[in-house]
C-alpha cells in the first residue's frame, strides 16, 4: 500500500521526526508497544508532489496534505510557530484552498518553560498572531491537536 500510486500520505510513527519525501511523514512519537506503526491515507486520484517555502505537500483536485519540519533551534517557539503558520496561509492562498480540515502540531518538549511560558503557550501565541493576520480566518479554523515529542523538531 505504501508504494500504491493512490497513496496520498504515509504517517510513520518512529523515534525521531525527519523528512524523507513528500509522501512519508515521519513523526517523533514511537508506538508504546514497540515496532513499526504506519497510518496510510489513500485517495481516488493520483496525487502530485509540490513544495512551497519549507512545506512539502501532495495534492489532488480536492485536497492538500502537507508537512513542514523545522529544527526547534531555528528560534523561539512563538516566532517559529508564527513563521510556520504564515507559510501555511500563503500556500493556501497560492493553491486557492480556503479551509484546512485538520492540523497536527508535533512540538518538542511541549511543557518545557522558555522565557516564562510553557512552549505550548508560546506556540499558541505565535499561531494566533499568524492566524489573526488572515482576514476572516476565524470562520475557517480547523480541528487541531498539539502533541509533545522528545525530539528536536517542530512538525506541522
Per-segment meaning from a language model:
Residues 1-156:
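Short, polar/acidic, helix-capping and beta-turn segments at strand->helix junctions
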Amino acid at each position: 500500500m505504501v508504494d500504491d500510486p493512490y497513496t496520498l500520505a504515509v504517517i510513520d510513527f518512529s523515534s525521531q521526526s525527519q523528512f524523507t519525501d513528500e509522501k512519508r511523514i515521519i513523526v517523533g512519537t514511537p508506538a508504546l508497544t514497540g515496532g513499526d506503526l504506519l497510518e496510510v491515507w489513500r485517495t481516488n486520484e493520483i496525487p502530485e508532489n509540490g513544495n512551497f517555502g519549507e512545506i512539502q505537500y501532495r495534492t489532488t483536485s480536492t485536497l492538500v496534505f502537507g508537512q513542514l519540519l523545522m529544527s526547534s533551534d531555528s528560534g523561539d517557539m512563538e516566532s517559529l510557530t508564527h513563521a510556520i503558520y504564515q507559510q501555511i496561509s500563503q500556500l493556501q492562498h497560492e493553491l486557492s484552498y480556503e479551509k484546512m480540515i485538520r492540523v497536527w502540531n508535533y512540538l518538542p518538549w511541549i511543557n518545557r518553560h522558555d522565557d516564562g511560558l510553557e512552549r505550548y503557550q508560546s506556540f499558541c501565541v505565535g499561531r494566533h498572531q499568524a492566524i489573526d493576520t488572515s482576514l476572516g480566518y476565524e470562520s475557517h479554523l480547523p480541528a487541531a491537536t498539539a502533541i509533545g515529542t522528545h525530539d528536536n523538531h517542530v512538525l506541522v
